Amino acid sequence: MDVVYERCAGIDISKADVKVCIRVPGPGKGTRRRGEVRTFPAMTSGLLAMRDWLLAEGVTVVGMEATGSYWKPVFYLLENDMECWLLNARHMEAVPGRKTDVKDSEWIAKLVEHGLVRPSFVPPQPIRQLRDLTRYRTDVVRERAREAQRLQNLLEDCGIKLTSVVSDFLGVSGRGMLKALIGGERDPRVLAELAAPNLRTRREVLIEALTGYFTDHHAFLAQTMLDRIDEATAMEQRLNARIAEHIRPFQRQVELLATIPGVSAHTAEVILAEIGADISRFPSAGHLASWAGVCPGNYESAGKSPSGRTRPGDPWLKGVLGQAAISACRTKDTYLAARYRRLVGRRGRRRALVALQHSILISIWHMFARDIEYSDLGGGDFLERTGKTRATRRLVSQLNRLGYQVNLQPVEAT
């Protein structure tokens, strides 16, 4: 095979050390290419020694497998001095039964040498920092939701059915009654008086819901859970402020994303943190959709192409695109809502939502590439473009089955 990269290296990374294999030209003209493997500690001093060796050998391209979080210090240390490739382990399976760390580094080096692998997308540092913040905020919000669920289960445990009467038991009314319960008040009539005026009309139901056996043990656990919920809320606010600072240089992209139906400011921040502002890293809209995992895989065999599952993709991006798709399908007189209604009947809700995620991401690629806002085609686009004849046939057929004979006459334009 042809050599694509004259001086390259492959790195197998573990927690304790890194195995580095270089592939460079031999000492004389026409001689065989030279390979050498060295082991370096994973500490910073060892990584610096590795970088010095690679620079001394004139290495220009380095490939490494995405192993947990261990690849990050290696990648970040080398990215300013040479081209770094983060490689997907599924794209470079070696021969079974002959796996060692040294052989893995040699195999990676040979794949890079002949250009047989493609690097994964690693955003630049500003986007990486923004991504760290948005992902951590998502974790904090999820943990707060889990803690609220624990508190709800605790109330059910002691027979307090507050969540059956109050839509948001952590709102003003719910918190007031919870605080009183924790403070020692057990009379349901007194507790019901703490509710907002709109809830007092259901006073008898509220009194019944607040009748239980709430003990000091439950009070201690409830206060602890409320404290954790409040801590998570305060942490989310700090993260929001920090994200606002980091996203300021990319305000134009956030404004573009906000023009898409179903995409909120929070959703726009997460999307930008996952795909970055430089959309040229993805050659086409199809490449972006494939990387994100919102398009079906290609599984052709014996001339047949069965329906394929979507690829794993980026779970953080797929999650927020799913939220945007759910919001978009509920909008009125929009292309995305019409597309959802067109697909949901024959393909089901899940596939229709994935199709909406795909449409949103395709639109984002074109918007970023051309620096233009989202232009909605409207809810009647499908009927005007493809569905008029089909809808006519369907309606005429229904009338025929009901015993009517239909003679269609076009309405003259006024």
Predicted stretch roles:
Residues 1-414:
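A detector of single, family-specific signature residues
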